Design a protein with these regions (language model features):
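Metallo-beta-lactamase
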Residues: 2-145, 152-155, 193-283, 304-310, 360-378, 384, ...
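Catalytic core of the metallo-beta-lactamase
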Residues: 118-122, 243-302, 318, 322-326
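Divalent metal-coordination and catalytic microenvironments
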Residues: 121, 131, 169, 176, ...
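Acidic/histidine-rich helix-loop elements
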Residues: 134-151, 257-263, 314-320
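Metal-dependent catalytic neighborhoods of phosphoester/phosphodiester hydrolases
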Residues: 176-185, 349-359, 385
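Cap/insert and terminal regions of metallo-dependent hydrolase folds
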Residues: 2, 9-10, 19, 24-42, ...
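Active-site metal-binding motif and surrounding structural segment of the metallo-beta-lactamase
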Residues: 50, 143-194, 211, 301-307
Length: 409
């Protein structure tokens, strides 16, 4: 027995040491700045005064349970294993168009989808960047939530100087540490949801550049050389005219949550309206379907163009992201003239086929009151009313796979 006990004790000791080393490494990594910082001081005081902050966390305007089925992740994996597995990643690199962002005529109002929920926008002579992810993963761990092949088209070095950087919320597929750090020398002003500025300030952004909005608040970029003001400071400001039209950035509600650690909803999430005298655009941010779309459409619409959360839906979290058919209804609620699907095309966060959102939204958009625009990543979408044709590019990826299958026969 003694002979057996010695190896057993050695194994137990080694196992304990390994567990201790792993725990120590995890605790050390937990101090990495990638996780951001919680709101403190004046920022926290403003958060606690928000009508949307209740019992220590931000709340949605209507009841929004996080999970909507009792099925566990393990059960879901087992069901997928037994049945037909979804093709959550494309079998080939996605077709893209790398537009030279520095060479674009700034007088042209346009939007360029950068994949998932990232957008480069030119509006009223200003350059706006929304939820950029210039990284090959969207998580605190490099092997989790990897980008699709072919979609790592741009880096921060490819961008011109940015007048306004907008971050809708602090999830890793919308706010990336590496990207934020790389963009810092290029960004003049930041507009984000209440509390998110704590992360950005911890990552080296000057506090005076950061403007945080509660739902319904407005940030105004004026047409003078005194660049901007928030709706929280309505005093008149004057300066020399820049020749650019005024731009309003309006924070709108959504049905979602936030958090970069296990403690959720300590910062706000938002959609946004971009409004100039000649254009109205809407970005939903992450959201489930709800009455807020009709309210936004009535108050701020009609919209020349909208992009809506159309992917990463799942029966387990039915209120966190929209089904394609719900997004179609939201586009009509908003009184949109054109609609582009978002939250798709770069990451796998749910377990549907990677191209299913495009197929379903195309079918559901037949006969609707808006035009469905489905550009490739990197292709400019012009907002001046010109005719533009957008082909179902995702079908070319499927055809490549089918052709490869036929070659093997």
């Amino acid at each position: 027995m003694k002979k057996l006990r010695t190896p057993m004790l050695i194994l137990l000791c080694l196992g304990s040491l390994a567990a201790l080393a792993a725990t120590t490494a995890l605790l050390y990594y937990w101090q990495h700045p990638i996780f951001g910082e919680p709101p403190k001081g004046e920022r926290l005081t403003r958060i606690t005064a928000s009508p949307n902050y209740v019992d220590g966390a931000f709340r949605n305007q209507i009841e929004t349970p996080m999970l909507t089925t009792d099925e566990s992740r393990l059960s879901l994996m087992w069901r997928n294993f037994r049945g037909k597995r979804p093709e959550t990643r494309p079998p080939q690199p996605l077709p893209t168009i790398k537009t030279d962002l520095r060479a674009l005529d700034l007088a042209q109002d346009l939007v360029i989808w950068l994949g998932h929920s990232s957008y480069y926008v030119q509006l009223g002579g200003r350059r706006i960047l929304i939820d950029p992810i210039f990284n090959d993963h969207a998580s605190p761990f490099s092997w989790v939530n990897r980008t699709f092949a072919g979609t790592d088209l741009y880096t921060a070095a490819d961008l011109p100087d940015i007048d306004v950087l907008i971050i809708t919320h602090d999830h890793y597929d919308h706010l990336d540490y590496k990207t934020a750090r790389a963009l810092r020398p290029k960004v003049t002003t930041i507009v984000t949801a209440l509390g998110v500025g704590a992360h950005l300030e911890a990552w080296g952004y000057d506090d005076y550049r950061i403007n945080e909005l509660d739902w319904g608040e407005v940030f105004r970029v004026s047409g003078t050389n005194r660049n901007s003001e928030s709706s929280r400071n309505r005093s008149e400001r004057t300066g020399k005219s820049t020749g650019k039209p005024a731009l309003e950035i309006i924070s709108t509600p959504g049905r979602h949550f936030s958090g970069r650690t296990f403690k959720r909803s300590q910062t706000l999430w938002m959609g946004l309206v971009l409004h100039t005298p000649t254009r109205r655009l809407f970005f939903s941010g992450d959201t489930g379907y709800g009455p807020h779309f009709a309210q936004i459409g009535a108050q701020y619409g009609p919209f020349d163009w909208v992009t809506l959360d159309t992917g990463q839906y799942n029966p387990r979290w039915a209120f966190m992201h929209m089904q394609p058919e719900e997004a179609v209804q939201a586009a009509e609620d908003l009184r949109a003239r054109a609609y582009t699907p978002g939250h798709v095309g770069r990451f796998t966060i749910s377990d549907h086929d990677w191209d299913e959102p495009f197929k379903r939204v195309s079918a559901a958009s037949e006969g609707r009151s808006y035009a469905l625009w489905t550009p490739e990543i990197g292709r400019p979408v012009y907002l001046d009313g010109r005719y533009q044709h957008f082909s179902p590019w995702w079908e070319t990826v499927t055809k490549v796979e089918e052709a490869a299958g036929r070659d093997d026969e």
